[in-house]
Amino acid sequence: MKAVVFIIDGLGDRPNKQGNTPLKEAHTPTMDKMAKEGICGIMNAVDIGVGPGSDTAHLALLGYNPYTTYTGRGPFEACGVGIDVKAGDIAFRCNFATVDDNLTIIDRRAGRIKNTEELEKAIDGLKVDGVEVIFKQSGGYRAALVLRGPNLSDKITEGDPHKEGVPIPEVKPLDNSEDAKRTATILNKVIKIAHDKLNSHPVNEERRKNGELPANAILPRGVGMVPNIQPFNEKNDIKGACIAGTGLIKGIAKMVQLDYIDVEGATGTPTTNLKNKADALLNAIKTYDFVLINVKGADEASHDGNYELKKEFIEKIDKMLKYILENIDKNEVYITLTGDHSTPIEKKDHSADPIPIVIWGKSVRVDAVETFDEFSTYKGGLCWIKGENIVPILLDLTGKAHKYGA
């Protein structure tokens, strides 16, 4: 038996004035079929009352306790862009930004610069006070930064004020340890050296000539020490894989040593190629015991406050699920359909509202739920669960769980 965890990123929502959500209003005959034939419930990925990030949510959905394994977003971003991170590294996500001569931020995204490969080379490989600087752009103005060396700490502040019109803040230690003081000093030096190198870089000289904003600074944030996480396959004694279009989810998969399946046209946006992702899933379950697939577009629509786009994208996912169900044997595969968090249109950000969930496959205890939405599935047999419960439930259903006790 195989298990699939199908994540519709940002799926859940809050009712509008008419009492509807994009999911409730969408035409979703396949999701409703799964609800009728499966066991339903509602879920909070991390915990009741906690609005999680996609990082902490996916750790929980993979069976890890985010309160003990999550150190910050930086390590997962760095891993996702292809940096071979090691336990003890200090990692950050970064923006290329535009600053003036006083390091006051003019634009946090450097005019949404498209190509930063040459700028990356100016920073990657630096040595500062015996610490190696690893830097990799991840498309456009985004990048990841890793500090590697002895006596480092993630107990430091960020180098990003998250707003414009203010200077790049001085990075400071958050405790009195020598490691934190040393790391803060090193990161401040990296920010200064990066500005010196980027400010006079030929790419930026050319941008100035063309009337474009220079990408002459970096803003590190999301600091975290790379955690030592038990590999997913070792933890569960199964072979697992991940399909996703976003670097963050890719990084989480790599961090827990799931095989990452690259899919052409998987963009992490509403224009992602759902057919290619579906085919990748169908191929993956031939050789893997467990596959997590993340589809991101609904979350993007939510962050933009676009109700109709979210509804339409959910309907596209329903057609994708129809294609998947038509090409698998229900007696051989369990599919868990849920989200990682709610992203209400009214809030344009993640919330703690629980998410609908259904587990579809043979021998599940089918309940009386007939539609898949935020208002129906809570009546189902799964009741109210947490993300960490999903993998153990699937291991039990697929006959791969070990008895606890004598």
From Swiss-Prot:
Biased composition (Basic and acidic residues): 156-165
Disulfide bonds: none
Name of this chain's protein: 2,3-bisphosphoglycerate-independent phosphoglycerate mutase
InterPro entries (UniProt xref): Alkaline_phosphatase_core_sf, ApgAM_prokaryotes, Metalloenzyme, Pglycerate_mutase_ApgM, Pglycerate_mutase_ApgM_sf
Catalytic activity: (2R)-2-phosphoglycerate = (2R)-3-phosphoglycerate
E.C. designation(s): 5.4.2.12
One annotated GO biological process: glycolytic process
Known pathway: Carbohydrate degradation; glycolysis; pyruvate from D-glyceraldehyde 3-phosphate: step 3/5
Family the entry assigns: Belongs to the BPG-independent phosphoglycerate mutase family. A-PGAM subfamily.
Entry-linked Gene3D superfamilies: Alkaline Phosphatase, subunit A, Metalloenzyme domain
Tagged with keyword Zinc-finger: no
Protein function: Catalyzes the interconversion of 2-phosphoglycerate and 3-phosphoglycerate.
Residue ranges, annotated region (Disordered): 156-177
Species of provenance: Methanococcus aeolicus (strain ATCC BAA-1280 / DSM 17508 / OCM 812 / Nankai-3)
Annotated Pfam families: Metalloenzyme, PhosphMutase
Domain of life of the source: Archaea
Keyword tags: Glycolysis, Isomerase
GO molecular function: metal ion binding; phosphoglycerate mutase activity
